[in-house]
Structures are given as C-alpha cells and as structure tokens.
Amino acid sequence: MEVAALFFMIVAMLLIGTPIAVALGLSSITFLLVLSDTSLASIAQTFFQAMAGHYTLLAIPFFILASSFMSTGGVAKRIIRFSIAIVGHFPGGLAIAGVFACMLFAALSGSSPATVVAIGTIVIAGMRQVGYSKDFAAGVIANAGTLGILIPPSIVMVVYASATDVSVGRMFLAGVIPGLLAGTMLMVTIYVIAKIRNLPKGEWLGWQEVFASGLDAIWGLFLIVIILGGIYGGIFTPTEAAAVAAVYAFLVATFIYRDMGPLATPEGQPNIPIWRKPQALLTAFVHRDTRDALFQAGKLTITLMFIIANALILKHVLTDEQIPQQIASSMLSAGFGPIMFLVVVNVILLIGGQFMEPSGLIVIVAPLVFPIAMELGIDPIHLGIIMVVNMEIGMITPPVGLNLFVTSGVAGMPMMRVVKAALPFLAVLFVFLILVTYVPVLSTWLPNTFMGPELITK
C-alpha cells in the first residue's frame, strides 16, 4: 500500500506539471519521511548511497561535451555531403542521405536531440528546396534522429550499464548491429515510398566526390575510431574514452575544420593559417564559441544528472522496500515465461517513454525488471538493447517525445503536425522493436563473440 502511495504521488505531480526530477525526488523523500522509519537526518546518507558506485556516469558529461563541439564545429555539413555522395542518387536520395548522415552523426554524439538539430537543420531545408514536402522531411529526421541513442557511443546505454552494473563496452558492441539494421530499415522504407510517390533523386556525383567528401569528413569520423577502437583495444575505459573524445572534438572543430573559435572565417572565405594568428593556440580555450559550447553542454549535463540523481533516490527506496523481489516472485509464481515477460516490459517502457525522459525511466525500471530477467535466463545485454529501443520510440511519441519538440523547432512546424509526419516511420520502429525483442542474437552476437557473455555475480 505504501509503495502504491509513492507511485500515486509521482503520477499526481507529473499530471500537475511538476518537472520529472522534482517529482521523483520529492515523492521519494516524502515517502522516506512519512511512510517509512527513515529520519530526516538519514536522507543525505540515503542520497549518497544511491549515487555511490555509479562511476560510469562520469562518461556522460564528456560525451555531451564532445557532441556539443561536434555540433558547433560544422562536422554535420561534411557528413551530409559525404552521405549525399554515397546514396544521394537513389530515389528519395536526399531523404536516404539524411538517415545515413544521422547514423554517422549518432556514432559521434550519443544523443538523439543533438543528432536531430545537427543533421535536421541542414537536411530539412535541403529537402524542401528540391521538392520534398515539409511533413515528409520532418518525419524522416524525427525518426532517424532516434538512432542517436542506439548507435554507440550512447548516453542512454551508459545509464543502463550504470543502473544494472553491466559492461559499457558490451552494451556499445551490442548496439552496432541493431543500429545498422534500424537505419537500413528506415532507408529501405524511404526508397519504397520514393518509388511509389516518384520522389526526386539526385545525380551520381562520381567516385571522385565520394573520396573528396570522405576526406573532408574523415577528421570528424575518426572520433568513432578513437572511442570504439580505444575501448576495445584496451587503451581506454569508457569514461576515459569519453574524455579523450571531448578533447579531440574541440581540437578538430577549432584547429582543423576551424568552424568555431578564433580561426573561424565566414563560409566561402579561405581559412586563416595558424602561423598568421599564433595567439589562437591560447585564445581558443577562452573564445566565445568555446564558452558557448561549454555552457550548453553544462546545462544539458546538469539537467540530465539531476534527473538521474533523483531517479537513483527512487531506485534506492524501491530496493529498500524489496519491490523488485516482490515483483519477481509474483510474476514467476504467475507462470510468466521469457516471451510474456518481454511483452510486459515493452508495454511498461512504451507507456513510460511517453511521459518520461529516457535516462530517468531506465534508472527506475531497469533495477525492477533486471532480477526477473536474470531468473528467466534473459541475457542482460539483450535486455539493455530492448530498453534502449523502447526509449527510441518514446522519443517520438507524444506528449513528452523530445525529438518531436526538437524537430518542431528545427522545421518550424506545429508539434502535432510533426507527430502525424512521424507516424508512418514509427510503424517501422515498432517492427524493429519486435525483431530486437525476439531475435536476441542481433544484440548478443557481437559482444559474445569479441568479449564473451556478460557474467552477473550478484
């Protein structure tokens, strides 16, 4: 009964418009004070215990900072040019190139909203110029942007790994095949629609443009090699890889591409050689562009970590009340097998994803369903990818789908119009969710092959 009161408080606060983090934290603290034996003096200790051991979360601010520099530094323009050179000549070529560019940028940013902003700002305008409807363009980008949390490195995967104490490296590997499959399914869908509607296609620009655009984008794309190669080559931990990625992204954006900082020039003008402005080596660190990128990354980090911190308090309360064990006992005694259990998990996450930010929802739900999944023999990495895919869908379902709001701003469209535009492609993601849920080898083959199965010792 007490736990029902806790969830009632959370839902009631969300319904009256209380921010998610405040609703989670305030409800949990009220529960500790009123409905449990915990004293006010012990709440700080409870908060400390909730945060203790989650050192993997240190990777999040660095990945956000790397994404901020990459978004500011014009890497997106080069990735889009490269994508158009490769797939732009197919029917619906610019839309397909938009999805391909989102896949590449997702491997740099780890964030869906950042992917929508960086790629959508350019691609939606370009699609309108060559004859696509604004609705079609917005629907493509809203859905393709969700790949930002599925293709590694992914901030949401880091949160899941921290909440369940599984390997971040295995989670990143597990996201590769599903990420490529989701992107391919979206591109094939666009191709079929383009053939039916006779949508415009570009010209084949030749291998010279492919190589030229690839060389132009290679410094940005090399970040993928640094992160994944560093982790799986045993050079970095995931947290160290995130920190190195942030430094590398700053150097590329400021000193190589020179799209930000003291060496930046208006588009179409030649770059300023470093020897003509040597003071840039120092002033770049305090330049307005750098400060802006740091400020934006800091705001997002504080928002995200505040949600996670309050969700961890709720997780701590639920664990103390032995809620996961009670749920596991009830479901197992009711005869739930793996198939039915995964149906229930998907329903819970799809509903929750409509109202909550992905990281906070995972911190709450993962500890509840994780013990049951282990009892049923479900691979913890497979469970993690299922949860991430559900979070993808949650980001494009109202009323709180973040990608819908971001796409609405980028495309200059009312939110409900973006929702309607995204629906046809949302159906593709539902089919993809079924595949990922019931074909576990899609998620487990790479991590099991290269790193062995995840071993849960507690």
Describe each model-derived feature in a short phrase:
Residues 1-458:
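Alpha-helical transmembrane segments of multi-pass membrane transport proteins
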